[in-house]
């Protein structure tokens, strides 16, 4: 879909969200999209972890822990169409990018399945990248269909996504992989593999949030 149509679609989703009855995404306080207390809970707290990928270990920087308010806000964006809340997560993603040394590297969001895109009408990683004032570069596409990752353990997740992505460009470019949440790192690892196979230089991976189940180093 052309970039201008994507932007229009996201703007329409934001406008629709403003017209609907609203409550705080973090605590359900009425008549406010995000209350002051919950907004403060989204203050960046960057953390680093590493994932294994063909070609070497990759650092993954996340701006928040995926729990509490952060988890509820992300779910509201993904499952309730509340795209305007992405603005509140922009500082966390920006902090992760800064710690990752992204600089002027190309930001490559994980692709969204056709089914998810049809259901939501927008791509969450792309939406988040735009909210930090950057342009997402769709250099990855699905080579095959994958199953739902929810409920799978680490090994099952890795098998589910193995060889599922292919790079469509990026050879010789410095790239940073972007997603909303990292759980086991299987999807990010597959993205790194595909980009490296296509000749890209992967600087790091970044996410808005990381599940607390993985060890992370706070900085």
Q: Which residues are covered by each model-predicted region?
A:
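Glycine-rich phosphate/pyrophosphate-handling loop used in enzymes and phosphotransfer proteins
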Residues: 1-219
């Amino acid at each position: 879909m052309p970039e201008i149509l994507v932007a229009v679609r996201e703007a329409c989703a934001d406008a629709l969200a403003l017209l609907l009855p609203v409550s705080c995404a973090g605590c359900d306080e009425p008549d406010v999209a995000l209350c002051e207390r919950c907004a403060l809970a989204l203050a960046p707290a960057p953390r680093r972890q590493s994932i294994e990928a063909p070609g070497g270990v990759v650092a993954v920087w996340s701006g928040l822990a995926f729990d509490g308010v952060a988890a509820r806000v992300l779910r509201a964006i993904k499952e309730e169409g509340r795209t305007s809340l992405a603005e509140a997560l922009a500082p966390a993603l920006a902090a992760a990018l800064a710690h990752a040394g992204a600089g002027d590297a190309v930001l490559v969001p994980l692709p969204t399945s056709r089914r998810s895109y049809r259901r939501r009408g927008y791509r969450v990683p792309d939406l988040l990248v735009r909210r930090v004032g950057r342009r997402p570069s769709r250099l990855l596409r699905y080579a095959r269909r994958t199953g739902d990752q929810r409920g799978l353990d680490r090994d099952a997740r890795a098998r589910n996504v193995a060889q599922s992505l292919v790079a469509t460009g990026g050879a010789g470019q410095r790239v940073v992989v972007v997603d909303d949440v990292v759980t086991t790192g299987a999807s990010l690892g597959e993205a790194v593999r595909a980009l490296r196979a296509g000749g890209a230089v992967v600087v790091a991976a970044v996410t808005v949030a990381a599940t607390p189940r993985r060890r992370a180093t706070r900085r």
